Curated annotation (Swiss-Prot):
Family label: Belongs to the UPF0352 family.
The protein, known as: UPF0352 protein PSHAa1818
HAMAP family the record matches: UPF0352
Segments passing through the bilayer: none
Top-level taxonomy: Bacteria, Pseudomonadati, Pseudomonadota, Gammaproteobacteria, Alteromonadales
Species for this entry: Pseudoalteromonas translucida (strain TAC 125)
Classification via InterPro entries: UPF0352, YejL_sf
Amino acid sequence: MPILSKYSNEQVEQIVDQLIDVLTQHNAPVDLSLMCLGNSITHILKEHVPTGKRQAVTENFAKALAQSVK
């Protein structure tokens, strides 16, 4: 069953393209890119997810990430 999102593919793709553009402008190698994106994810989780839900959200995110690179 496909995952349904409340966001359009176009909206997601535009934001991803902008993130990739910034990394490209800085000639960021893979390790630096992953560090920056990881730090951004950590910031989003700490600032926008209630403490009691962070562990579950983090685990779900990690599972989704692992599935997306298989």
